[in-house]
């Protein structure tokens, strides 16, 4: 079952309807390499969860290096939360699931509706539609996602969040690639859940072209580049690190939401590049 079909594109826009529209839809899917993503999915759809994540990474020869891997031996026994920056997009969630769901099979990551189409990983996904603005009314699917996250934690299972709700972009002001402001609604949810938090930082990102497209044309055009970014990550290993657990005492020391949000973001972006890493092969062989 493909992730996206030309028929579904025709439902999104009249531009892709009729014989000519379907031809155009097919060409667009080739241009942005959605057809390659469909083929990647079909080759590995017999796997589920963490096994699917592993199969996809193996298929594309995508490697990563995990810093502070010893923290995986100190994971809380009950529910916990992971928080992460989001520099690469879909591949960030896939790596998180391979790492954490192999230890805690019930681990789920809150993802957007696009990644939520990957049915082979639906057991490890909570699907939402990020609003991105404080005053936007959450859609029904997002409200269901919030309820699912609460239920996940109350049942004693871990859940992962990308608090930005969007892939990182290039900030000319800060002269670096960074997440936009983390969503207030998610910060409130994390605080309400009141369980240990594990920061995870991804130290690498997408291509220069990806960020340039975002600067010149906005997030819509940049989104079309994401399939290629997923498919072209084999050149060098991606680096990520796990930080110290943020316990309940540290969380309770924050007297307001602003200081709480700052503590969470600082726990990720303040994480230094680890001095030593464990290769993906070594991690899976543990």
Model-derived features with residue positions:
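Membrane-anchoring hydrophobic helices of lipid-metabolizing enzymes
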Residues: 1-83, 93-95, 102-106, 122-123, ...
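Non-catalytic C-terminal accessory region of glycerolipid acyltransferases
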Residues: 2-6, 142-286
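A conditional alpha-helix N-cap/helix-loop micro-motif detector
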Residues: 46, 62-63, 138-143, 179-180
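Structural motif
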Residues: 81-83, 126-127, 160-162
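Gly/Ser/Thr-rich loops at beta-strand to alpha-helix junctions
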Residues: 86-90, 167-168
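Short amphipathic alpha-helical face segments that pack within enzyme cores
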Residues: 91, 95-98, 185-188
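Glycine-rich, phosphate-binding/catalytic loops in enzymes
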Residues: 98-101, 177-179
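Conserved nucleotide-cofactor-binding alpha/beta core module
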Residues: 101, 106-142, 146-147
